[in-house]
Amino acid sequence: MKNLLALAICTILLQAAAQSQTEKWDLRKLIDYAAKNNISVKQADVQARLTALQLKQAQLYQLPTASFSTSFGPQFGRSINPTTNLYTNNELFSQSYGLSGNAQVYNWGRLKNNIAANEFSAQAALVDIERAANDVSLNVATYYLQVLASKEQININEVQIAQRKAQIDVTAKQVAAGTVPELNLISLEAQLATDSSNLISSKTTFDQNVLTLKALLNLDAALPFDVETPSVDKIPIESFADLQPEVVYQLALGNQPLQKENELKIKAAEKNVLVSKASMYPSIFGNYSLNSTYNNKATDLTGSKIPYFDQVNENFRQSLGLGIQVPIFSNGTNRINYEQSKLNLKNNLLNKEQANQTLKQNIYTAYTNAVNALEKFNAAKKNVASAQKVYDFSFRRYEVGLLGTLDLITNQNNLQTAKLQMVASQFDFVFKMKLLEFYKGQGLKL
């Protein structure tokens, strides 16, 4: 029994030590970690590597092809001697060598434009990594704020529960003394149950926000985790005058990764139109071949067998040539590919227009939200000032015996709740201003 008790105590102490040693994450660390470990960012990186290989393949298409072949074996019955080109009925052993290949000479710029298209695609894929990291950073910052907000909400709920319990204690004494009906106590107990339920909901929301944040970081859900609460008063923010939505939008067009990526995709699509168009025209190519043969029955004029390497040298022959390939009928493939490439270009132009429209809408919405958040923050400050005055006045009345303890505690808790709500609204306002700075190209930092 003593051993079990000691084990339980050790377990509790270890858990407490682990919790105290849990490293707290600030926003900068969260964003940096997510940029390296988020699955979406890793997938974008893999896609960029695949696109780089496609570019390398397009560049290698410029080089001539070369293939080597050799064959050897016996021949039986009536067959052609590969060295003399005469029919023979004798069994013989022969071997042949061949090296051949071809090279594109002129193809209406198809190879050059294909390389250019793949270069733009490779650049777009690299920018897509930045876009994925950007999106993840924004999501991380959003859930970081929600974690902070849900922590503050838990504090507010706990203050409300403490206030309700104090009211219940006083009311229970009044009921016992017969000064108030029991219904008052029952109503307060019912309200306490509601407050407790609200606290549970707040804790559930907090846990869900933490789990989502862990998923964005690609962290194990069971890993101990906590975020650092910054001193909101020390966070620098720009003025509304420097964050006018139209100004921010014009800057965002040049600094947001998605907008850069769309421009590169359009350039790649334009080159692909030229590639597919060139496929409908004739192309000129060169070819070459090097060949030699050997057989074990070859003899010279004296009837002596010709040695192996002498035969290979004497039978060595070369050829060079030019060819032209004219696409006369390809089941409509070339024409359809050309039309598809033009539609793909048009689709990329529409994607750019849609993305820019969405960006502008997001920026104007963010600006409106920031203005509303400032109004809520100002209202929360006024609420704190009012609650402070009420508490100061009630405290003076309490000191001279004109106010009961319950009323003083209620006013004190109201002040605490107002302060917590003000901090939450201030965080919300600062984040919405930081979102505008993010669109402006300044990143996300507190």
Predicted regions and their residues:
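Acidic, low-complexity, intrinsically disordered peripheral segments
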Residues: 6, 19, 221, 421-446
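Small/polar, glycine/serine/threonine/aspartate-rich low-complexity segments that form flexible
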Residues: 21-23, 69-103, 231-240, 274, ...
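Periplasmic alpha-helical coiled-coil/stalk elements that build and connect Gram-negative outer-membrane
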Residues: 25, 135-251, 369, 373
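A short glycine-centered flexible hinge/capping loop motif at secondary-structure junctions
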Residues: 175-179, 398-402, 439
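Short flexible linkers and secondary-structure junctions
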Residues: 20-143, 284, 288, 332-335, ...
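Sec/SRP-type N-terminal targeting helices
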Residues: 42-46, 59-60, 91, 105-133, ...
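Bacterial N-terminal signal peptides
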Residues: 6-13
